[in-house]
Amino acid sequence: MHQTKARKTLKDAPVMWRRINSIGIILDCNSTYAANLGYAKSEILGKPIFEHVPKESWEAMNDSLKTWFETGEVTDRKITFKRQDGSTFPGLLQATSLYDENKNMLGSNTVIFDLTQMTDEKITEYKKFFSEANNRLGEIKEKEY
């Protein structure tokens, strides 16, 4: 129940969100992620993350994965992403690990900011979203414990 509410918060996010498994296959994403990349969600799920990165950025994405495997998170990693139409955009990637009850890594929740959209208006929208999301997640946590 609580995971469903937390997941809904991510699915409704104005930022790109995806969940991957431990080998980099996309298990879920929000509509913002799909729309920014120009795909239907069904075309994204089950694909490797490298399909949304131009070849010249594979090394940067691979370094990001390596950092994630070693530390369980990635913070402020600049990566170039590729849309379905072949155009690219600079993104800022943040990832945190997901673990099972035995502390085995299952995958990650990843948030990506399109740096070409970082206007004052967008930053205000993001701040509002994250403030509200933090409050909702706090309420969920209080009910859970």
Locations of regions flagged by a protein language model:
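Conserved hydrophobic beta-strand signature of PAS-family and PAS-like sensory domains
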Residues: I26-L27
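PAS/LOV and related PAS-like sensory modules
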Residues: M1-S22, T124-Y145
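Charged alpha-helical signal-transmission linkers that cap and connect PAS-family sensory domains
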Residues: Y99-N102, T116-D120
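PAS-family sensory domains
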Residues: I20, T80-G86, L93-T96, Y99, N104-L115, K127
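PAS/Per-ARNT-Sim sensory domains
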Residues: K55-K66, E73, R77
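PAS/PAS-like sensory domain cap-loop motif
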Residues: Y33-I44, K55, N102
